[in-house]
Amino acid sequence: MVHASLWQFRLQIIPWRLRNFCFLTSQCPYTSISSPDTVSVSSYYSLTSNNDQSLFHYFDHLLGLCLTAQQCRQVHAQVLLSDFIFRSGSLAANLISVYARLGLLLDARNVFETVSLVLLSDLRLWNSILKANVSHGLYENALELYRGMRQRGLTGDGYILPLILRACRYLGRFGLCRAFHTQVIQIGLKENLHVVNELLTLYPKAGRMGDAYNLFVEMPVRNRMSWNVMIKGFSQEYDCESAVKIFEWMQREEFKPDEVTWTSVLSCHSQCGKFEDVLKYFHLMRMSGNAVSGEALAVFFSVCAELEALSIAEKVHGYVIKGGFEEYLPSRNALIHVYGKQGKVKDAEHLFRQIRNKGIESWNSLITSFVDAGKLDEALSLFSELEEMNHVCNVKANVVTWTSVIKGCNVQGRGDDSLEYFRQMQFSKVLANSVTICCILSICAELPALNLGREIHGHVIRTSMSENILVQNALVNMYAKCGLLSEGSLVFEAIRDKDLISWNSIIKGYGMHGFAEKALSMFDRMISSGFHPDGIALVAVLSACSHAGLVEKGREIFYSMSKRFGLEPQQEHYACIVDLLGRVGFLKEASEIVKNMPMEPKVCVLGALLNSCRMHKNVDIAEGIASQLSVLEPERTGSYMLLSNIYSAGGRWEESANVRALAKKKDLKKVSGSSWIEVKKKKYKFSSGSIVQSEFETIYPVLEDLVSHMLKKGPTHDGNNYEDDLDLWTA
């Protein structure tokens, strides 16, 4: 009764806002005070007290109870009426923090801007407003506030500097690393773990792992975050060796790796192509008793796809189910790719169909799986399904999707379809990336489609991809294969950091078009530039020697491969030297090389020797080679037709007819080759038998005119006359 009477009397002199608030707080389910009368009396006593400490605890308690914007603003009103906010930086800081927690950034900023100037020297106030901005992604605002703070002569402390360093990291202001590092040293915070860890995180983002390592070594105290930052930093630099050294050092210092540590180690080895090591470290992670993260599983399954290690992936698949990672899409998508790449597309599709909310990454995983398994029709069907789903669930094909489809068509020899999908991709306003561009340039090189290749080159320049080494190499290859070596050479010379592929592309280009001396010159220049030639480079230069008839130079390169370059000749190299010797008539030497090969000769080697026998009408060697080829390629007609032509050239018509009859008896059919020609930006495809009778009268006079010009040129470098092959031109 006493409390009730007192409440009725004092209610009359408390402002209406505060009365409402008293009732509001008394009804709050989280308050520990059950009696509204007690709350009201306590409230009034606190408001009329001159004890700042009591007021602070009272308002701080109320702020802790606030769950809504209305409640927080009512407490704010009480604080303003008490004038206490102008005396307490701590209370203002707490009020800012509560507003920020509720997402009311404008209210938080309003509190900060209305405090007295005296309180602006309180670092707690600055910390609260900076934290409010950084936690809500307003990084520019945070940096602007920090500049204002510095202009007032204030220096950041161990709470403020980590916030500013985090803002710099997210904004990409990596150039400020050194400035803040100096500031940390000047204000004596170089031993503050939170500050140094944030600085340690910023350096790798700036690509300055050397500075990060020096800072790390100087740290008197480290925690697990310090070690993880360094391992992840080296991982992003593709420096597996350094990442492993830090990882081993961490364990020597008795820090146990956690999920973040293991995931960084796995990612590092995966990015560096050290797939076997990924399996090793994944096993060690499981043996250590650490919980396996979804990210680690995604990396592991991606590596299983690369290694085609389906059996290993299947064992861990059970862990995914038991560990509750089935709904974690990155690991599920990687698992889809594992099954798909191994040809188990039904299992891959089953996993895909189980996903309830499919993102574009899931669609891409299955489409890529179909493409890798050579099931192009299924990939295109799924792509069409995705296009239809776009209208239902707003999942749209991205650059990865389009590139997979374009690549799939190209691999299956459907270059025209690839270009059509590329046009559709452009129409859909999806920007091509470097992988897409390289794929299209490869198609342009194979068709060839020079005009489109030039258009792509223009696109590369406009989109600032001209410094991408993959794109530059693809351009060199495209121009070289299309016969425009002058343009290819210009692109090649413009490459600042040439790699082995750059050199191989230009050497091959010169060689295939008969510029052997230029190809050899570029080969020597490559070696003098410090590059060690690989097998592809040696194939290119040997092929150049073959086309130009440079026998001695070709012999020199071939027989010095092992001693000079540390490379043992492979099938392709043997094919080149056999072709070189065979073209100039050294059939016996070429035949001996084939007989003495350390491995069984494959089709490329035997085919080169058989073709040389055709050139020089050598039936004896040809018969044995054709017999070997028919065993290696029982369903191909090539060796039969070549042997038949050799018999015909030697006047042995009966044997020629017998060979053709044998091919017919085995029901072997010649697969017609196709050719493309580009006229006025339009490509035309034609093959043997595709020309109708009415077009003969137009085509053959032109063909005969070309042959007559070739005959006037006389014999080729290998001593053969074009007239010997006239039957092939008119067949």
Curated annotation (Swiss-Prot):
Source species: Arabidopsis thaliana (Mouse-ear cress)
An example Gene Ontology molecular-function term: RNA binding
Keywords: Repeat
A single GO BP: mitochondria-nucleus signaling pathway
Designated name of the protein: Putative pentatricopeptide repeat-containing protein At1g17630
PPR repeat residue intervals: 88-118, 122-156, 157-191, 192-222, 223-257, 258-292, 293-327, 328-358, 359-393, 398-432, 433-467, 468-498, 499-533, 534-569, 570-600
Superkingdom of origin organism: Eukaryota
Stretch list, region Type E(+) motif: 681-711
Region (Type E motif): 605-680
InterPro entries noted in UniProt: E_motif, Pentatricopeptide_rpt, PPR_At4g14850-like_plant, TPR-like_helical_dom_sf
Family: Belongs to the PPR family. PCMP-E subfamily.
